[in-house]
Amino acid sequence: MVENSTQKAPHAGNDDNSSTKPYSEAFFLGFNNPTPGLEAEHSSTSPAPENSETHNRKRNRILFVCQACRKSKTKCDREKPECGRCVKHGLKCVYDVSKQPAPRIPSKDAIISRLEKDMFYWKDKAMKLLTEREVNESGKRSASPINTNNASGDSPDTKKQHKMEPIYEQSGNGDINNGTRNDIEINLYRSHPTMIMSKVMKREVKPLSENYIIIQDCFLKILVTSVFLDTSKNTMIPALTANANITRAQPSVANNLLKLKEMLIRQCQTEDEKNRVNEFTDRILQNTNSNRNLKIGMLLSMLYNSVGYQYLEDHCPQGGEYSDLLRNLINECEAILPSYEIIERYKNHFYEYVYPSLPFIELEIFEESLSQTIFPDPNNPSKVQIRMGSTHLRAKVENLSLLLVILKLSYMSIRFLDHSTADSSFYLSKEIIDKYPIPNDFILLSQRCLASENWCACANENIISCLLYIWSFFAFSPEEGDFFLEHPTDVISSLIMMLSTSIGLHRDPSDFPQLISPSTSDKRTLNHRRILWLSIVTVCSFEASLKGRHSVSPISLMALFLNIKDPDSLTVYMNRVRGDLSDINNHKLLRIHKFTFKRAQLALLLSDLDNLTMTYYGSFHLHSIEFIREKIEIFVEENFPIVPLKSVAQDKSDLDDMNVISEMNILSSENSSSFHNRIMNKLLMLRTSMAVFLHFETLITKDKSIFPFYKKYFMVSCMDALSLINYFNKFFNGEYRHAISSLTSFNVTKFIQLALSSTIFSLLGIILRIGLAIHMLSSEVQKLSGTTDPRIKELNTKVEKFSTLQRDLESALEGIYCSASEHLRFTYFPVFKMLALFDVIVQRMRKGELWHGIFTMIQMEQMHSRIIKTLSITLGVKLDKKDRLLEELMACNHVANFSVEDIDELNRNIKKEIQISSGLKPPVNTIDLTNGEPFGNAVPTFTKTWSSSLDNLEKLSSAAAVGQSLDYNSGLRQGPLAGGGSKEQTPIAGMNNLNNSINATPIVDNSSGSQLPNGFDRGQANNTPFPGYFGGLDLFDYDFLFGNDFA
């Protein structure tokens, strides 16, 4: 049984004859029973209000709603013995099913199905009540009339590993009602309209998008704002803009970046690392010759035709000449392609390690076409000859276009591996990769090939396949994407969806007589179309879920392809695939089809979260989210296990067998896809739980009775974030090397990069709230000191336990920060930018100064109006009312109200989820600047304070640490603060004293550390209108975060 699921009393119908043998319990519960909360707005099958019973002209239809709801024409949840609406309004609930005239010709199948569903409903109801009684006996929570009659239909789930009690009574708080509710109706989308705006753009932020937590979390907004603001002159770093002219208007921006670049290059150990530093710094400055501009051009080139009105011919007469367009394309392909042997090596690597995860082509047809087109050049062994023949010219060009993208993807999948520790490819060595790189020009040429065919008007399976691989390039390429910018890959996926429906991919190919006729179509195209559609539904669903946009209703499109609600839908699909296989012994292809179908099922399940959180009219029950969580987690555990690779071998001698090696490679691809599916699941659960928590945080100041929900989702968010960190750490520490080869892990690291921002920011927000709770509790202890108030002991116990919890969470956050720095910083540009911000934050956290900087910002005076306006329309921070910021934060922070038992429970759950070593502290980088020159001519020296394998951490001291972080303390301790207040008169001093009194992490004195280098002295910086050194984060190119010239 699934906890928090809802089994509604069924209604009879002739079409209700679904099988009672589910392939998957989760799918049986997920698709045969609609998710609670989605019926009203997102289901096309919601029952319409019933007409009067006196209409004899209509056939008899038994109504299963209660009399009160039927009379008021209101949707009834059909709970027994009383529906939710009647309980809410105190009405008498009467179900008169037995009194209604039965249908003239009743359906036996419908009756049997109805009785079976009734049985499941009452069984689920009984298990729910039994669970409540057991919990009441254990004293963990109290029952209430609302619990008994609620529409949630909870049932226990023994598979959930980290189950936390949803609600339990808050003792000692008179504002909270006696007895707790376990459900409430909420609305996230309408209640929290969120927009990022500048003078050049506007963008709505959806509840499940990456930026929602940054924009919606008031704690994080204030922290980020305190980092943006300079503490000496109350000015903001101006270069947070997409306007490249800022480097000319403020030359110090470019100068500081070049100093950072020089320092980082000195720490690089390989040429690859140096190239990445050059590329990333050029991209931040937006040089005209940088790869980023090329990438933008690549994306935009898909939207226009570069060949005018000339299009490729499909055949030419024997002995005739090709068109100029075709000849030019042939010449370009021959010029760019490497030798035939190298092509084969890249292609075979793709087949072995990439294709199982991205199965968008029909391999046999593709290989047959290439074998008739590409040949070794007898005059030049390093080149190939392309012979097009006289027929099927367009299909051959399409396959050439596919080849170009495939070669790039094959190169990309192995290019950024650490070859000193990575598994060795049977086909590609580091020498081959270095000698024969595949540049981005391959993608551009592929797009020109498509444009030459007028691809928007003349779509086919090959063009769809090529577009899917182009999407894969933009989605998985480490250079693509940006922190705080939503990478517009969904533009490509939307085009693919549009073209796919135009050629009928959304219907099973057996529906079309032309496709099943051997005289008009290749039989192998049938299964190709099937796997293409599954892939498209998966891609579009993932895009919509990750970015929080309105989904394209893939579940309705799947209805024309296959009845996905059927528990045996996988069996039906696989039978169709087997029936159309040209080689019935092709077990690899069958296996790929099966796994692709499961991945599409997961994408559809996850889309329920998007639909739920995007509800605008009305609201949804909180138990709907719990229902979705449970069914998705069960489905993931059942269908995406991580299987050891050696399980396919009987003994060690089999490991040398090529068939066994091929089988292990397929399993490794499945494991890598399973792993990133697990990350995807946890990521969306985290974003959902944080969105719900932030919703309750905004309401709790007005309604104290929702404290149990606030507490629950604070804990759930914490556990979701730690669960993701646990996955990251296990992967980076090599605990999955027995199951996932590094050659198939390109998609894993990409999904980790996608999840990293949400994970780190969520955990940081939790740490900020705990830190403020410690401050609030300690303040209360000081007020009560000298009295005999019995609460002092409890308050001190809370402070101690919260301090332990804070240190554990900070260690977890710092650990994943270091892992991301070592493995991702110089591979993924979004991580490079995000960690530049976190360099400052982590430095503050190490010194215990997260709140120190916030308190200092609150004391500022005479802020520039441009700063106030900019931060208001982008982050939503009201700096014109900053004197009330701290009061508002303390008012909405109810973490201090957690009981000692609550804190103990959270601590226990954290220890179960992730092992935090109390003595594990990441290295503190110290930079030798004794020569007095900015960054000096000498190589900066680093001191490691722990024994670790993080050899690359020497490269992590960005100028952010040099500028703002390393000097942050000394700057704050130099006399009075801006605005005239002394340090002793600010809340900071009190916070420092509290830190010392509660044995929290003290603020480390930086007097013995590095001095601020010449050229970055605050006095010199203040002479300019915008003082900001690099530590002020003046090198971000948030394209829509800050406008170019706010007046």
Curated annotation (Swiss-Prot):
Assign the protein's first listed, main location to one coarse class: nucleus
MF-aspect GO terms: DNA-binding transcription activator activity, RNA polymerase II-specific; DNA-binding transcription factor activity, RNA polymerase II-specific; sequence-specific DNA binding; zinc ion binding
Q: Which residues carry this modification: Phosphoserine?
A: S155
Q: Quick one: a GO biological-process term for this protein? A: cellular response to oleic acid
Q: Which InterPro entries match?
A: OAF3 (IPR050675), Zn2-C6_fun-type_DNA-bd_sf (IPR036864), Zn2Cys6_DnaBD (IPR001138)
Q: Does the keyword Transcription regulation apply?
A: yes
Q: Where is this motif: 9aaTAD?
A: 1034-1042
| Protein name, UniProt field | Oleate-activated transcription factor 1
Q: Which organism is it from?
A: Saccharomyces cerevisiae (strain ATCC 204508 / S288c)
Q: What is the lineage of its organism?
A: Eukaryota, Fungi, Dikarya, Ascomycota, Saccharomycotina
Gene, per the UniProt record = OAF1
